[in-house]
C-alpha cells in the first residue's frame, strides 16, 4: 500500500484511488433506485466524511453532499450531541466495520440500499383552513425521501442504544443492515410502512 505525500495518513490502493476510512472502496457502489441517483452522492474521493459545511451555503445543495457525511450529521441531533462531529464520525466508522464483518459486503453499498429502502414514497399533508382540516395523500420528492430515510435510521439507532448494553455503533450497524434487507425489525422500515399506510387511507 502506497501512502500519498500530499495527504499524510491517506492510503491509496493499487489503482491509486482513495478509500473511505482507508478501508472501504468507492468503486462498484451503485444506487439501484433510479429516482434517487441524483440525490445519493457516493463519495467525492474523500477519506473522511467531513466537508466543513461546504454544502449548506445554497438551498438544495446538500443533495450533492456525500451520503456518509449526511448520516454522520444526522447522528449529531439532540442537543447534547450538537457539534460532536468527531464522536459521530467514530460511531459511523465502527458501525461500518461491524457491517463489513456481518455481511461481507461493502458497507457503503449496504448504506445506499438502506437509504433507498426506507425513504417513504407517499405521505399525507394537512389541507384546508382552521375550520375544516383534512389530510391528503401526496407524493414525496426524492430529496425528502433521502432526508427522511437518514433521519429514521439515526433515530432508530439512538432509541435502540438508549439504556442498552449494546453500543450505538452496534445498534446503527443493525439498523442499517435490517433496513437494507427491508426487514420489519428495522425502526426505519416500520415507520416508513406506517407513513405509507396512513397516506393510502387518505387518498
UniProtKB/Swiss-Prot annotation:
Keywords from the named record: Cytoplasm, Nucleus, Ribonucleoprotein, Ribosomal protein
SUPFAM superfamilies recorded: Ribosomal protein S7
Nucleus found in the keyword field: yes
Major localisation: cytoplasm
Signal peptide: none
Pfam families to which the protein is assigned, alphabetical: Ribosomal_S7
GO biological process, one term: cytoplasmic translation
GO cellular component: cytosol; cytosolic small ribosomal subunit; nucleolus; ribosome
InterPro entries the UniProt entry points to: Ribosomal_uS7, Ribosomal_uS7_CS, Ribosomal_uS7_dom, Ribosomal_uS7_dom_sf, Ribosomal_uS7_euk/arc
Subcellular location, record wording: Cytoplasm; Nucleus, Nucleolus
Entry keyword Ribosomal protein: yes
GO molecular function terms listed in the Swiss-Prot or TrEMBL record: mRNA binding; rRNA binding; structural constituent of ribosome
Purpose of the protein: Component of the ribosome, a large ribonucleoprotein complex responsible for the synthesis of proteins in the cell. The small ribosomal subunit (SSU) binds messenger RNAs (mRNAs) and translates the encoded message by selecting cognate aminoacyl-transfer RNA (tRNA) molecules. The large subunit (LSU) contains the ribosomal catalytic site termed the peptidyl transferase center (PTC), which catalyzes the formation of peptide bonds, thereby polymerizing the amino acids delivered by tRNAs into a polypeptide chain.
PANTHER family in the record: RIBOSOMAL PROTEIN S7 (PTHR11205)
Note: There are 2 genes for uS7 in S.pombe.
Assembly with partners or alone: Component of the small ribosomal subunit (SSU). Mature yeast ribosomes consist of a small (40S) and a large (60S) subunit. The 40S small subunit contains 1 molecule of ribosomal RNA (18S rRNA) and at least 33 different proteins. The large 60S subunit contains 3 rRNA molecules (25S, 5.8S and 5S rRNA) and at least 46 different proteins.
Family affiliation: Belongs to the universal ribosomal protein uS7 family.
Protein name: Small ribosomal subunit protein uS7A
Originating gene: rps5
Amino acid at each position: 500500500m502506497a501512502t500519498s505525500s500530499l495527504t499524510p495518513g491517506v492510503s491509496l490502493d493499487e489503482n491509486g484511488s482513495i478509500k473511505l476510512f482507508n478501508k472501504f472502496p468507492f468503486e462498484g457502489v451503485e444506487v439501484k433506485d433510479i429516482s434517487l441517483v441524483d440525490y445519493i452522492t457516493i463519495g467525492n474521493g474523500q477519506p473522511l466524511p467531513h466537508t466543513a459545511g461546504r454544502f449548506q451555503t445554497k438551498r438544495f445543495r446538500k443533495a450533492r453532499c456525500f451520503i456518509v457525511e449526511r448520516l454522520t450529521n444526522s447522528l449529531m441531533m439532540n442537543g447534547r450531541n450538537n457539534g460532536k462531529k468527531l464522536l459521530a464520525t467514530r460511531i459511523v466508522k465502527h458501525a461500518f466495520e461491524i457491517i463489513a464483518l456481518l455481511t461481507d459486503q461493502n458497507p457503503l453499498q449496504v448504506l445506499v440500499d438502506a437509504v433507498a429502502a426506507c425513504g417513504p414514497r407517499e405521505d399525507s399533508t394537512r389541507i384546508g383552513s382552521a375550520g375544516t382540516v383534512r389530510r391528503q395523500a401526496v407524493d414525496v420528492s426524492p430529496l425528502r425521501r433521502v432526508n427522511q430515510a437518514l433521519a429514521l435510521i439515526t433515530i432508530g439507532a439512538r432509541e435502540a442504544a438508549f439504556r442498552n448494553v449494546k453500543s450505538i455503533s452496534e445498534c446503527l450497524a443493525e439498523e442499517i443492515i435490517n433496513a437494507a434487507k427491508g426487514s420489519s425489525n428495522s425502526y426505519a422500515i416500520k415507520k416508513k410502512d406506517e407513513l405509507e399506510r396512513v397516506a393510502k387511507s387518505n387518498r
